[in-house]
Amino acid sequence: MVLDIIKKTLREYNLLNNGDSVLVGLSGGADSVCLTHALWSLKDEFDIKLYTAHINHGIRGEEAKRDELFAENFSKKLGIECFVLNADIPQIAKDTNVSEETAGRNVRYNFFNKLCEKYYINKVATAHNRNDNAETLLMNFMRGSTTNGLCGIPYVRGNIIRPILNVSRDEIEKYCSDNGLEYMTDSTNLTEDYTRNKIRHTLLPYIQKEFNTSFIKTVTENACLIKDDSDYLDGIAEDFYKQHIRNCAVNIEDLNKTDSAIKRRVLRLMLRDIYNGLNDISSTYVADILSLADKSSGRQINLPYGIVAKNEYGKIILEHKKEETQPFEVSINIGETVFISELDKKVTVSETDMRNKDGAVYLSCDKTDKIIVRNRRNGDKFQPMGMNGTKKLKEYFIDKKISKDKRNSVPIIEINGEIAAVGNRIDKRFAFKDKGIKIECDDN
């Protein structure tokens, strides 16, 4: 019966193709033993080549060594090559400032990826089952989650496949018993030190006993229905994203034309891009970012790992937090090139008797004039070309919608103590006539 369920899952979700090489994560527990044996039984029918991978996490001492030897021997009996990695997960977790669970997951999938690259393996099979799915759904619901989190564990994500996701733990243990398969028991799975184990050993049995004996089946089937709806909304959000998002920025006016369900998904897509994934990004951050749309320009919030979200002149922007440009002032003579470290740019001043449309700044200037390149100071004013009177630099930046964090990076050209240009905007008193200087500002 279990093999029939697995075969149906493999075909329904197109998890395998003829000729696939599959790496099975083999911990030695009942789930991974069942998965390994089932795929081994089906390898000729599906024309696949199998490998196994085992990680000794360095947490349970002799018990972990026992599991390692079991995984190697079990694989050998089936004629499957087994790869083993020994890792000090507690130390890695400490060094990288993450939980042991997160460190273990990172090490595990990094190991899988390296093996796939080295041995040209194109699929990785993990032993998540229906009970795992129910536990994940309850965990996500209790800690707060998006709709996607209530869809449960996916059958396939990238090259990761989960062939026994529709098989219950009871069915797995019966499969092992019927086929005479031994398996190892992780003692930490029998304790209640971790949230998932409390759900597994206390909450789920209580719900099944007091409310619904088929709760695991019910909740995972409901998750499939939620996923159908969620996939439809995700598609709409993806279309919006392609049309309206540029460099992790979205016009608030465009965003507000969509429904709240689409707004949240669009923001999660932006977070996915800037974080290169969504691990550890709470739905609370999505709500916080969305609230920026109702606030004034210039408001911002700090997100984890050095990311900032801000409302900037009608846009919500996500970007890596930048260090503020420090004050600088550099003297330069005609015919010289200077490097300004605060801008990481080279500035070149040359004499010229003609003006081109090449993006450079052209100013009237004599050879004896004192030229300085600096950034803004309090009280700065200038007389922009095409405008009447004097303009405060602060007002000019606001009019040009130059954000506060970028204003210190705008180069200001000063001649004989007067502002001659702000960026590419020339002061009319220094407008180029018959001859003068050409100023070029290039990346280093």
Spans of model-derived segments:
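Short, surface-exposed loop/turn segments at secondary-structure junctions
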Residues: D186-L190, T213-I216, N279-D280
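AMP-forming adenylation/ATP pyrophosphatase catalytic core
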Residues: L3-T9, Y13-D31, K49-Y51, I55, ...
